[in-house]
Amino acid sequence: MVAARARRRKRASVTQLYSTCKAAGTCPPDVIPKVKGTTLADKILQWSGLGIFLGGLGIGTGSGTGGRTGYIPLGGGGRPGVVDIAPARPPIIIEPVAPTEPSIVNLVEDSSIINSGSTIPTFTGTDGFEITSSSTTTPAVLDITPSAGTVHVTSTNIENPLYIEPPFIEAPQSGEVSGHIFTSTPTSGTHGYEEIPMEVFASNVTTGKEPISSTPTPGVRRIAAPRLYSRAFSQVKVTNPDFISKPSTFVTFDNPAFEPADTSLSFEEPTDVAPDPDFLDIIKLHRPALTSRRGTVRFSRLGQKATIRTRSGKQIGARGHYYHDISSIAPAEELEMQPLLSPSTNNYSYDIYADLNEAETGFMQPTQTTPMLRSPFSPLSTQLPSLSSSVSSSYANVTIPFSTTYNVPIHTGPDVVLPTSPTVWPFIPHTSIDTQHAIVIQGGDYYFVAVYIFVTQTP
């Protein structure tokens, strides 16, 4: 039978052996070098550390404490940084309290200096205080009136030599003397100031041309007409006149009790077929508009359809222009204009008219002889041919002569045509000397041609 082997006990550590065997001097030979770090491995590290730096890794036979400097964390430098250490506060001294002393500690130390305050006055007399009284008859009133000084009174008189009014009788009025002199009632004298006419800015009388705003803008601002006939709107003509008064009956079968005619109409998502197929899927009808196009008065509304509905709830659809022609505008009638006066028989450009009632006595002589043409420079004389003028008194067209310097007869021009005119030049119309006639001249341009005849004098 094999005897049981005794259990091996663990040897004590080097530090424990060194603390017990150092005093007795019985330390094993391998304990003291390990404690003092003089083993062969320690010496090799010391010799190699003279040439290389191992970073304080603590390689040796001692405990793994990282050597004298300890372990360095990864990512740090080779040497630890300088750490600022704040000065330490002085420790608080705890004083014990005896059982017989109170537990309340005074925060303020007792002072040995006692302040007794101000000194108490001492009275030596025995009569006490002396009371005196005084009386006066002057009231305690402060004089706030300033000291008297000189007062300068000035007056201003303005005269305008360019405009002087007639003097008015005014009497002087007293009691109104200040820096300027004014008169409140008409008194004797003449105005000493200039009267400026006042202009009325605000008046109840309006002319219709006043601006309606404080800063009127010149010109006329025109409101842009709705673009109902663009490509964005489909044109739908509605022939039923109920579209003007009851537009909702074309979308739904329900007829509301009150339906405003000038507002937009909104409808819920249609579930049934619309009464009118043109209004299918209509969800909104905008407010109406009256326009005139191509000779008609047109009632229009814009309609919004909801044909497609997205997942987000947005409705997409086309827009249409629904219109109904109310009435046609007839063209303006052309009225034939009738003349108010009968057409005149005289179509001449230049005519001279005389009063027929007074002209009857002036045209009774049948003939007229042409006078002699004499020149003041020559004794010669020239006899012009004698022509007859048979102008009837029933005609109103009479040509009158104009006087000339050398008694030259005046003949009719191409613009004046007589009823019975001779073809031989010249023609001298008959004039009446004793009868005055009222003459009316109608025309625009008159030309006076002076005819001069010069006769040479022979020696």
Curated annotation (Swiss-Prot):
<keyword id="KW-1177">Microtubular inwards viral transport</keyword>
<keyword id="KW-1040">Host Golgi apparatus</keyword>
<comment type="subunit">
    <text>Interacts with major capsid protein L1. Interacts with E2; this interaction inhibits E2 transcriptional activity but not the DNA replication function E2. Interacts with host GADD45GIP1. Interacts with host HSPA8; this interaction is required for L2 nuclear translocation. Interacts with host importins KPNB2 and KPNB3. Forms a complex with importin alpha2-beta1 heterodimers via interaction with the importin alpha2 adapter. Interacts with host DYNLT1; this interaction is essential for virus intracellular transport during entry.</text>
</comment>
<keyword id="KW-0945">Host-virus interaction</keyword>
<keyword id="KW-1039">Host endosome</keyword>
<dbReference type="GO" id="GO:0003677">
    <property type="term" value="F:DNA binding"/>
</dbReference>
<dbReference type="Pfam" id="PF00513">
    <property type="entry name" value="Late_protein_L2"/>
</dbReference>
<dbReference type="InterPro" id="IPR000784">
    <property type="entry name" value="Late_L2"/>
</dbReference>
<dbReference type="GO" id="GO:0075521">
    <property type="term" value="P:microtubule-dependent intracellular transport of viral material towards nucleus"/>
</dbReference>
<feature type="short sequence motif" description="Nuclear localization signal">
    <location>
        <begin position="1"/>
        <end position="12"/>
    </location>
</feature>
<keyword id="KW-0238">DNA-binding</keyword>
<comment type="similarity">
    <text>Belongs to the papillomaviridae L2 protein family.</text>
</comment>
<keyword id="KW-1160">Virus entry into host cell</keyword>
<protein>
    <recommendedName>
        <fullName>Minor capsid protein L2</fullName>
    </recommendedName>
</protein>
<keyword id="KW-0946">Virion</keyword>
<keyword id="KW-0167">Capsid protein</keyword>
<dbReference type="GO" id="GO:0075732">
    <property type="term" value="P:viral penetration into host nucleus"/>
</dbReference>
<keyword id="KW-1163">Viral penetration into host nucleus</keyword>
<feature type="short sequence motif" description="Nuclear localization signal">
    <location>
        <begin position="454"/>
        <end position="458"/>
    </location>
</feature>
<dbReference type="GO" id="GO:0042025">
    <property type="term" value="C:host cell nucleus"/>
</dbReference>
<keyword id="KW-1015">Disulfide bond</keyword>
<feature type="disulfide bond">
    <location>
        <begin position="21"/>
        <end position="27"/>
    </location>
</feature>
<keyword id="KW-1048">Host nucleus</keyword>
<dbReference type="GO" id="GO:0044174">
    <property type="term" value="C:host cell endosome"/>
</dbReference>
<keyword id="KW-1176">Cytoplasmic inwards viral transport</keyword>
<dbReference type="GO" id="GO:0043657">
    <property type="term" value="C:host cell"/>
</dbReference>
<dbReference type="GO" id="GO:0044177">
    <property type="term" value="C:host cell Golgi apparatus"/>
</dbReference>
<comment type="function">
    <text>Minor protein of the capsid that localizes along the inner surface of the virion, within the central cavities beneath the L1 pentamers. Plays a role in capsid stabilization through interaction with the major capsid protein L1. Once the virion enters the host cell, L2 escorts the genomic DNA into the nucleus by promoting escape from the endosomal compartments and traffic through the host Golgi network.</text>
</comment>
<dbReference type="GO" id="GO:0019028">
    <property type="term" value="C:viral capsid"/>
</dbReference>
<keyword id="KW-0426">Late protein</keyword>
<dbReference type="GO" id="GO:0005198">
    <property type="term" value="F:structural molecule activity"/>
</dbReference>
<keyword id="KW-0597">Phosphoprotein</keyword>
<dbReference type="GO" id="GO:0046718">
    <property type="term" value="P:symbiont entry into host cell"/>
</dbReference>
